[in-house]
Amino acid sequence: MLSVMVSSSLVLIVFFLGASEEAKPATTTIKNTKPQCRPEDYATRLQDLRVTFHRVKPTLQREDDYSVWLDGTVVKGCWGCSVMDWLLRRYLEIVFPAGDHVYPGLKTELHSMRSTLESIYKDMRQCPLLGCGDKSVISRLSQEAERKSDNGTRKGLSELDTLFSRLEEYLHSRK
């Protein structure tokens, strides 16, 4: 039963995160600072993400006619680490860059959220918080997601608040 729930959640993620591969990959500027490795150290940046998202949420969700698919089971269980790593990379490399084309009037807000999320992701990668094992499942999900269109971008951006909640849950589960 658990494997069916996890499998169903992963398949749903693949659908809504699919976006155009024409988007440029994310670039991250690496600073010579030591990352914060405690989940509570991410609270301020997550709050900043939520505040920015709240300003643009009506626009992003206006065209989203799908139900919420990024449920809490996604980051729990044996694949949670790999799923969170894949989700964050997907948002930074594909969803946010494609969002610039889908929502040109929201470029400032999207760039702000992307920059903050990049900072969180970079710190997490330098900490043991995302030390994952086998990525073969995520690799298959990624290949499937690449076949989607702008609907994946719209869905991904409209559910940013859910992503932020799942990220927070994940960070707290790694204490």
UniProtKB/Swiss-Prot annotation:
Assembly, per entry: Homodimer; disulfide-linked.
Protein's gene: UL111A
A GO cellular component entry from the record: extracellular space
Signal peptide: 1-19
The protein's name: Viral interleukin-10 homolog
Organism, as annotated: Human cytomegalovirus (strain AD169) (HHV-5)
GO MF term list: cytokine activity
Residues the record marks as carrying a glycan: 151
UniProt main location, coarse: secreted
Biological process according to GO: immune response; symbiont-mediated suppression of host dendritic cell mediated immune response; symbiont-mediated suppression of host innate immune response; symbiont-mediated suppression of host type I interferon-mediated signaling pathway
Pfam families the record matches: IL10
Alphabetical list of PANTHER family matching this protein: INTERLEUKIN-10 (PTHR48482:SF5), INTERLEUKIN-19-RELATED (PTHR48482)
Keywords: Cytokine, Disulfide bond, Evasion of host immunity by viral interleukin-like protein, Glycoprotein, Host-virus interaction, Inhibition of host innate immune response by virus, Inhibition of host interferon signaling pathway by virus, Interferon antiviral system evasion, Modulation of host dendritic cell activity by virus, Secreted, Signal, Viral immunoevasion
Superkingdom of origin organism: Viruses
Family: Belongs to the IL-10 family.
Disulphide connectivity of cysteines: 37-127, 81-132
General function of this protein: Functional viral IL-10 homolog. Can bind to the human IL-10 receptor and compete with human IL-10 for binding sites. Requires both subunits of the human IL-10 receptor complex to induce signal transduction events and biological activities. IL-10 signaling pathway has several immunosuppressive activities that are exploited by the virus. Inhibits TLR-induced type I interferon production in host plasmacytoid dendritic cells.
Compartments, record wording: Secreted
Keyword Disulfide bond included in the entry's annotation: yes
